[in-house]
Amino acid sequence: MARENKKELIGKVVSDKMSKTIVVEIVQRKMHPIYHKYLKVSRRVKAHDEREESKLGDKVKIIESRPISKEKRWMLVEVLEKSK
């Protein structure tokens, strides 16, 4: 069976109050189809943080994974920047 390419996203941790779970906000720029202006579109996803190494405000990289719970489909890969 061939290994699939999994999606990777970079975002900011907006909540770390759950056990082994973080909430990551991903901000993307999309162009409006009629007006051709760029809009900021953000979404929040829950990610699994096994070692609980990320804190509020950190910039992190997450990767798509199998369903871990009802809402968790992402796993933390690495912390890119620590918050100050």
Swiss-Prot record:
UniProt GO molecular function: rRNA binding; structural constituent of ribosome
One Pfam family it belongs to: Ribosomal_S17
Any one biological process term the GO annotation gives: translation
The keyword Coiled coil belongs to this UniProt entry's keyword annotation: no
Gene3D superfamilies registered for this protein in UniProt: Nucleic acid-binding proteins
InterPro entries in UniProt: NA-bd_OB-fold, Ribosomal_uS17, Ribosomal_uS17_bact/chlr, Ribosomal_uS17_CS
Keyword Ribonucleoprotein among UniProt keywords: yes
Cellular component, GO, one term: cytosolic small ribosomal subunit
Keyword entries, A-Z: Ribonucleoprotein, Ribosomal protein, RNA-binding, rRNA-binding
Top-level taxon of origin: Bacteria
Record text on subunit structure and interactions: Part of the 30S ribosomal subunit.
Assigned protein family: Belongs to the universal ribosomal protein uS17 family.
Stated role: One of the primary rRNA binding proteins, it binds specifically to the 5'-end of 16S ribosomal RNA.
Listed name of the protein: Small ribosomal subunit protein uS17
Species of provenance: Borrelia turicatae (strain 91E135)
Gene: rpsQ
